[in-house]
Amino acid sequence: MAFQPPRVALLIETSRSYGRSVLHGVARYSRLHGPWNFLLTPGDFAQAPPQMRDWHGDGVIARTLDQQMAETLLEMEIPTVFLDYPVDNLPRQKYRKERCVDLTSDSVGAAQMAANYLLGKGLTRFAYAGYPFQRWSISR
């Protein structure tokens, strides 16, 4: 039987810089360590195709804000990487660490780096204006 590259669904928004950067990194990894076959549907956070349950892939990399979408991905029982998703919100009986991981940014480290930079410039009065319901923003 001929080699079949892994099939990986990329459920990542393509309309924002962060999503495009993630896609660029995944593509680079695939070039170095692959090849992988990708399933990518351009769009925003709620972009999983309705037939996702019937897709027979080998893994998923997802940035979703939708609880139902996250649970659907877990029900597929394939390795899943969640980007900045609060996995604490997932039902314990569905979430299994051996096949699911949550990749988050170091928000505290980013905040410290920004503060140190501003302090190094002699600024002592500054503030952060973030997004109220974004996990990464709240931590900063």
Give the residues covered by each predicted segment.
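Bacterial carbohydrate/catabolite-sensing allosteric modules
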Residues: M1-I61, M69-R140
